[in-house]
Amino acid sequence: MGGVALPSWFTADDAAYLSGGVVEADPAAYASLEGFSSGEFQIAAEDAVGNCIPMKATALLANAALQRSAIETSNALFGWECYPAFYGSSIAEMPSRHRLLEIAEKATSDTLATASHIRDGLDALSLRHPEQRFFVYMGPDSMNVEGSPTAKLISNPLTYGELSSIFEDEGGHFQWIDGNVTFDEFADGWNSTDHHWNIQGAFRAYERMASALGFRDELLVPARLVTYDAPSFRGTFARRGLETRYVDQMIDYEFADFPQLSIIIDGAEASMDSLVHWKNYQAANVGANAFTSRYAEYFHTDYGLITLENEESDSRQDLLIVADSYSNCMERFLAVHYRTTYVLDPRHDDETIDAFLAQHQDVSDVLFIMRSPNMLAQATEHALEPEDMRE
C-alpha cells in the first residue's frame, strides 16, 4: 500500500485477535485426494481466508455482545445460574462466580467405552512392566467437576465421579490418584477464563500425587504466592465465548530453596527460564494480544519431551510423566523428588511408552497427568499400544 499505515482492523492482526495468533493455515499441505475427502483442505483454505478478513474480530465480539444482551434479559425472568455466552456457544457465563465455564459433555456410550478401553490399555501397560510403578491422575475441569451448574443444562452429563469409577476399578495394576474436588475448590484453584488450573489448584494436585508416590513427608512448602497484576489473562473460554469482561491474573509460588534443575527440551539444552518465564513477566516482556495464552506464555508451551535433571537429589530413581498441558506449571515440583524426570506429551511425541521404557531403564515410576479429553484421546491410545504392534 505504498508505505501507508493501515488501521489494525484492516490487517490480519485483527483476524488473529481472538485466537492469540494467526491461525496456522497451509492449504497446499492438504491439496490431495485424501485432503479433499477428509475435509482438511477446506478447513485450511477457510482458515487462510479468515486470517485476512478486515474487522473480523470486531464483528465477532459485537455480534456476541448483542446476543449476550438478549440472553441476559431472558435470564432476568428465568434466573439461570449460568447461561451460554452467546447463542449456540459451548461456553457458559456464571456471573455469581464471575467466571466462564465449558458446558458439560454428555455421558454417551461411546465416551464411556473409550474410557474403559483406555483403562484396559493402562492396565495392560502396567502388566507388561512389573518392574515399574504406574500412577494415573486425571485432572478435573469445568466440564466434569462435581457440582458444576452447566451439568443442569444437558441431560445425562458426564461427571468426574463417573469417569473415576471406571479408572479406579478394583483389580487394576496401576494406582488411581483421585483428583476429585468440590466446586468451591475448583472455583479457587482453576482460572476463571481458561481450561487450565492456576498454581494453587496445581500445587494441591502435586501434593496428592507426591503423597501417592511416597513423598508425603518431603512435600515442598511455598514461601509466598506471587500475583502479577499485568498482563490480564483472558484464556480459551474468553476467546471461545467472545467475552472480554472476565479476566484472570497470572499467579505463581516462590520457594525459599528450590533446587537448580538442568533442562533439555526436545533434545536441545535449555534452562529453568524456559519452563517458567517469570523474568519476562517481571520485565513486562509479554504479548500485546489481549487473548494471548498467558498460561503457555508464563509457564511454557507444549513439547514432545522435556528432561529435568536434579543434580542436588539424593534419589537414584527416575520418573516418567506422561502428560498434557496440565503438567506444564507443576512438573518442576515433582522433579524435586527424583534424579531425572522425563515429561512426554503423546500429542507431540509418537513414541510408545514401551519403547521409551526400553530406552530408559532407570525409570522407576510412571505418572499420567491429563484432563479427560486428552486422557481419552487417540494420541494416548497410541502411546499405550504394545511396541510390537508398531512393528
Which residue stretches match the model-derived regions?
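Extracellular glycan-modifying ectodomains
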Residues: 1-391
